[in-house]
Amino acid sequence: MATPPPKGPRHVRDFARSAFVALALAATITGCFTGERPRFGCAPGESTGRIEIDEVLNRFECVATSTFTADYTVLTRLGDIDSAATVVQASSGRRSITINNVRFIYDNGRTLTCDLVSETCEAVINEARTSDLLLTSEFYAQSMASRLRVDAERRIGDPVASNVVLGGQPALCVAVPVTGGTKTYCALESGALARFDGSDLLVELTSYSSTPDEAAFGT
């Protein structure tokens, strides 16, 4: 018989980090698949069987075709930690994701994880740098797509769709009831996350522009 894991704040935090990293790894191999609902040259993955969920998934899974600058506030509920994040997605797959003082850069085959305070970088994407916040460089779309697919399978009731305005932009939302509460996912037409409200995180869009901020690629 397996010995149950010890309980306590440290072990809860370690479990949360491990679970989030697992979702992040799933997100990194999730892309756009050939399907029946094409959108701007990209088609989402397999249908969940509920259009309310699929329409939001469609946006998340096809974010790669969009260019934008998006600012977010983040609350990591475990530890009650407030953070700020900025995502810049430019053409040719160039991306910059800044979470507090950590910047992840994907730039024409070059990858960097930089500390903006010490002005030092490592030539890899080191997701561990923000694991204490339960955030990865994919938090703004692909991580959310992976989470939403898991919640679609685990839901205990009907999803509810809604339309809201967040960060001055119209967004499509779906609320999914799961054991322990309801999780809400909202996405912009571009595919960028507009809001996520779950038991571990609250992420909200505060401002948005369709123009990529090239300064965000600086280190």
Can you say where each PLM-predicted feature lies in the sequence?
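An acidic-aromatic
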Residues: 86-141, 193, 201, 205
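A short, amphipathic edge element
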Residues: 146-160
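N-terminal leader/targeting segments and the immediate start of mature chains
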Residues: 2, 8, 13-94, 215, ...
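Short, exposed beta-strand/loop patches in secreted or surface proteins that constitute
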Residues: 84-90, 103-105, 156-165, 185
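Sequence contexts marking disulfide-bonded cysteines in secreted/extracellular proteins
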Residues: 31-33, 39-46, 61-63, 113-115, ...
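Gly/Pro-enriched, hydrophobic low-complexity segments
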Residues: 162-219
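Extracellular/mature segments of secreted proteins
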Residues: 48-56, 69-72, 121-132, 194-195
